[in-house]
C-alpha cells in the first residue's frame, strides 16, 4: 500500500513562492497506519530526541532563522538519495528533479530567481552520506520503498493570477494539491493507499476537487468539517484521503513534506534577498511575512519603481 503526505511552506508571506510538496512510500499492508518515527528509528527522529538521526518533524522546529539550513538539508538530501534522481547540485537542479510532469517551469517570471544557488548549501557531505546510509538500512529492514517526492513552487505572478481567477488564495493550495495528487496516483496506478494532507484555510468540503481529479472513481465523503475524510473508490483500488490541521505533528510523511517545502522556499528566499541586496545595499533581509514584508517593500520601493517592475510580480495580493 501507498502512504502519501502533502504539506506546504509559504502560504502566509507576501514575498517569495508558495511551495507544496508530496512525499510517498510503498509499505507492507501491516504498516499502512504505523508510526514511521518508530519503524525507521534510529535513522530518523523528532527534534526533541537526542542523537545523530535525521530530523523529521514540523519544519518550524527543524529550521530556525539564523541557525542555517543544515538540519533541513541533511534530511532532504538523505531521502533524495533513496530515489533514482540524478545528482542535484543547484537549486534549479533540485526543482527540476522534484517537479511534476504537468508543472510549469518554476519561478520563470520572478525577477530575482536564477537557480544557481549551490546545494547542499550548509550540511557537510559526510553527514548527509552517513544519514543516507542509516536511512537506507532502516528502509530495507522495514521493507519500505521510498519515493516519489514531488514539489511545486508557485511564484508570485502565478499566485496572483490564481487569486484573480478564483477570488481566493486558498485556490492556490487546491491547484497544487491536485497536481501533486495526480502525479502520485499516476506513479501508483493499481495500489490502495492512504493520503494525509495538512489542511490550511477555511475549506471543509473537498469532494468536488477530488471528483474532478478522479473522474473515473466514486468519491465518498466519510467526514467533513475541521477534519475531512474521503474514500476515492475504483473497482481495483481504494485511496483514503484525510485533510486535517497540523497533520505534520502526527503524520511522518506530512512532516517530511513540510521539510522539503520549507527547504526549497528558504533557498528561494536566499536568492530573493541576494537580488535585492545587490540593488539596495542597505536593505535588511526578510523572510517575507506580513509586517516585516511591509518594511522591506518600503525599503526597496524607489528601486522597484526605477526598475519598472510591476508590483504584482513581487508582491502577493493576498
Regions found by a protein language model. Give the residues of each.
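RNase H-like, Mg2+-dependent phosphodiesterase core
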Residues: 1-318
Amino acid at each position: 500500500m501507498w502512504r502519501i503526505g502533502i504539506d506546504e511552506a509559504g502560504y502566509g508571506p507576501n514575498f517569495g513562492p508558495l511551495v507544496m510538496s508530496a512525499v510517498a512510500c510503498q509499505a507492507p499492508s501491516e504498516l499502512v497506519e504505523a508510526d514511521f518515527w518508530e519503524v525507521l528509528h534510529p535513522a530518523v527522529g523528532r527534534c526533541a530526541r537526542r542523537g545523530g538521526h535525521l530530523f523529521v518533524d514540523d519544519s518550524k522546529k527543524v529550521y530556525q532563522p539564523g541557525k542555517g539550513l543544515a538540519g533541513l538539508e541533511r534530511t532532504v538530501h538523505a531521502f533524495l538519495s533513496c530515489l533514482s534522481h540524478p545528482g542535484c547540485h543547484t537549486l534549479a537542479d533540485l526543482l527540476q528533479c522534484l517537479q511534476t510532469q504537468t508543472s510549469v517551469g518554476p519561478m520563470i517570471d520572478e525577477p530575482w530567481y536564477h537557480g544557481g544557488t549551490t546545494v547542499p548549501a550548509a550540511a557537510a557531505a559526510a553527514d548527509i552520506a552517513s544519514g543516507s546510509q542509516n536511512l537506507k538500512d532502516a528502509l530495507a529492514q522495514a521493507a519500505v520503498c521510498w519515493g516519489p517526492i514531488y514539489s511545486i513552487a508557485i511564484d508570485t505572478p502565478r499566485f496572483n493570477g490564481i487569486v484573480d481567477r478564483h477570488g481566493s488564495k486558498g485556490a492556490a493550495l487546491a491547484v497544487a494539491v491536485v497536481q501533486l495528487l495526480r502525479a502520485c496516483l499516476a506513479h501508483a496506478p493499481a495500489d490502495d493507499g492512504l493520503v494525509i494532507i495538512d489542511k490550511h484555510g477555511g475549506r471543509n468540503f473537498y469532494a468536488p476537487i477530488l471528483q474532478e481529479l478522479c473522474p473515473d472513481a466514486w468519491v465518498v465523503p466519510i467526514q467533513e468539517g475541521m477534519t475531512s475524510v474521503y474514500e476515492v473508490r475504483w473497482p481495483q483500488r481504494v485511496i483514503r484521503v484525510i485533510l486535517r490541521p497540523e497533520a505534520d505533528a502526527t503524520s511522518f510523511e506530512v512532516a517530511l513534506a513540510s521539510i522539503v517545502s520549507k527547504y526549497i522556499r528558504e533557498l528561494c528566499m536566499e536568492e530573493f534577498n541576494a537580488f535585492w541586496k545587490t540593488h539596495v545595499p542597505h536593505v535588511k533581509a526578510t523572510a517575507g511575512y506580513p509586517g516585516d514584508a511591509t518594511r522591506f517593500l518600503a525599503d526597496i520601493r524607489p528601486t522597484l519603481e526605477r526598475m519598472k517592475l510591476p508590483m504584482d510580480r513581487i508582491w502577493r495580493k493576498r
